[in-house]
Amino acid sequence: YPMTDAKMIRGGALLARALKEKGVDHVFTLAGGFCNPALEGFMECQMPVINTPHEQIAGHLADGHARITRKPVVCLVGPEGFANAVPAMLEAGGERSPVIFVTGSSTLKRQGAGGFKEIDDVAIAAPLVKYSAQITDGERISEFVNRAWTAATTGYPGPVHISMPVDIMFSSFAPDAGLDERPFNRTDRPAPRAWPDPTALGVVLEKV
């Protein structure tokens, strides 16, 4: 999927930019393969990428980070590593951790034909997370990220899952792709905390 124009950027970089705009500041992964354009995008956004020896470790580290900070973080895995991340996905759901699991999935145009590393990750993740969807159009990457972020941070916080086919991940798009598609909030919002605000609690204690 060569880039024919120096001004064009890959779908993975659009994904990284959209997550950066929402406020994500850490990514946990097992680097390589289908996810390379996203990893390059995260590095261009100067976002710390923590490389781990196994996808389950990446998922649990992301879960732990989200529990402490109460801020959404990303766990990025390839299609063959998705199954390894499922236990962490289940654990994050039980602990209400706003982890955004992103799968670099098999090619969209060969879906259902037994393509290379094909797995129905959206269906597998659906009962474990608050939102599970596949990006089907590179022009709508920011829209899918916004939906996932909203689900992860509203009501009871919890994990979400986005599947990004490799052909969209590596394809080239205009830098402003999807920005005029429809209006939506491109900024972050704090995730609800499971404990009182320390400042408010201090005020109460002073009055006791």
Where are these regions (language model features)?
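N-terminal alpha/beta PP-like core and its mobile active-site loop of ThDP/TPP-dependent enzymes
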Residues: Y1-V208
